[in-house]
């Protein structure tokens, strides 16, 4: 799981959605137990702990720039950070990483960056 990842989809209250075109969501899980990344408009950081497939993320802190465009970027950012913090389990298959919430739902899917 350690390393840089690009987000491909996020679970929101109304279902799973792909990342909005023209935006980039990322997460880099460091060997020091810190996660950093881009939530589209802002950057974030915080602790994470991984024990086997069990995972806890957060609390996350982020910069607070306003998202002016594209449409929906602000909501996407809030949804991504909430989904990331909701993760309790991870599953990695090759270059794909899936984070699941406590209900067993896919919260975030990511592809290895690069």
Which residues make up each language-model segment?
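Lipid interaction determinants
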Residues: 1-114
């Amino acid at each position: 799981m350690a390393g840089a990842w690009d987000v491909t989809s996020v679970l929101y209250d109304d279902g799973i959605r792909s990342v909005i075109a023209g935006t980039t969501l990322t997460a880099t899980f460091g060997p020091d137990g810190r996660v950093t990344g881009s939530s589209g408009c802002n950057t974030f950081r915080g602790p994470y702990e991984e024990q086997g497939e069990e995972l806890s993320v957060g609390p996350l802190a982020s910069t607070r720039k306003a998202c002016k465009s594209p449409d929906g970027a602000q909501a996407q950012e809030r949804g991504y950070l909430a989904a990331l913090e909701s993760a309790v389990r991870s599953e990695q298959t090759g270059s794909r990483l899936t984070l699941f919430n406590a209900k067993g739902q896919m919260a975030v899917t990511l592809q290895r960056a690069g």
